[in-house]
Curated annotation (Swiss-Prot):
The cysteine framework is V (CC-CC). Residues 1-20 form a propeptide. It comes from Conus arenatus. GO terms for molecular function: toxin activity. Its main location: secreted. Belongs to the conotoxin T superfamily. Keywords: Disulfide bond, Neurotoxin, Secreted, Toxin. Coiled coil: none annotated. Contains 2 disulfide bonds that can be either 'C1-C3, C2-C4' or 'C1-C4, C2-C3', since these disulfide connectivities have been observed for conotoxins with cysteine framework V (for examples, see AC P0DQQ7 and AC P81755). This is Conotoxin Ar5.4. The keyword Disulfide bond applies.
Length: 58
Protein backbone atom coordinates (compact mmCIF):
# COMPACT_ATOMS: atom_id res chain seq x y z
CA UNK A 1 0.00 0.00 0.00
CA UNK A 2 2.80 2.44 0.84
CA UNK A 3 4.43 1.74 -2.50
CA UNK A 4 1.20 2.46 -4.41
CA UNK A 5 0.75 5.71 -2.43
CA UNK A 6 4.28 6.77 -3.35
CA UNK A 7 3.69 5.96 -7.01
CA UNK A 8 0.40 7.88 -6.99
CA UNK A 9 2.08 10.89 -5.35
CA UNK A 10 4.89 10.82 -7.92
CA UNK A 11 2.39 10.69 -10.79
CA UNK A 12 0.39 13.60 -9.35
CA UNK A 13 3.61 15.60 -8.96
CA UNK A 14 4.55 14.87 -12.57
CA UNK A 15 1.10 16.01 -13.74
CA UNK A 16 1.45 19.28 -11.84
CA UNK A 17 4.87 19.89 -13.37
CA UNK A 18 3.46 19.29 -16.86
CA UNK A 19 0.68 21.83 -16.22
CA UNK A 20 3.26 24.37 -15.04
CA UNK A 21 5.40 23.71 -18.12
CA UNK A 22 2.40 24.17 -20.42
CA UNK A 23 1.43 27.44 -18.74
CA UNK A 24 5.03 28.67 -18.83
CA UNK A 25 5.22 27.79 -22.51
CA UNK A 26 2.00 29.66 -23.29
CA UNK A 27 3.11 32.73 -21.35
CA UNK A 28 6.51 32.66 -23.05
CA UNK A 29 4.85 32.47 -26.45
CA UNK A 30 2.58 35.40 -25.63
CA UNK A 31 5.60 37.43 -24.57
CA UNK A 32 7.37 36.60 -27.83
CA UNK A 33 4.31 37.52 -29.89
CA UNK A 34 4.02 40.80 -27.98
CA UNK A 35 7.65 41.62 -28.71
CA UNK A 36 7.21 40.89 -32.42
CA UNK A 37 4.08 43.04 -32.59
CA UNK A 38 5.86 45.80 -30.71
CA UNK A 39 8.85 45.71 -33.05
CA UNK A 40 6.61 45.83 -36.13
CA UNK A 41 4.65 48.72 -34.64
CA UNK A 42 7.87 50.61 -33.83
CA UNK A 43 9.13 50.11 -37.37
CA UNK A 44 5.92 51.72 -38.66
CA UNK A 45 5.62 54.60 -36.20
CA UNK A 46 7.81 55.71 -33.32
CA UNK A 47 4.81 56.88 -31.29
CA UNK A 48 3.93 53.23 -30.79
CA UNK A 49 7.29 52.57 -29.14
CA UNK A 50 6.52 55.02 -26.36
CA UNK A 51 3.01 53.70 -25.79
CA UNK A 52 1.96 51.91 -22.63
CA UNK A 53 1.38 48.78 -24.72
CA UNK A 54 5.06 48.15 -25.32
CA UNK A 55 6.96 49.77 -22.43
CA UNK A 56 9.94 47.43 -22.90
CA UNK A 57 10.64 48.92 -26.32
CA UNK A 58 11.18 52.51 -25.16
Amino acid sequence: RIQSDLIRAALEDADMKNEKNILSSIMGSLGTIGNVVGNVCCSITKSCCASWLFPRLE
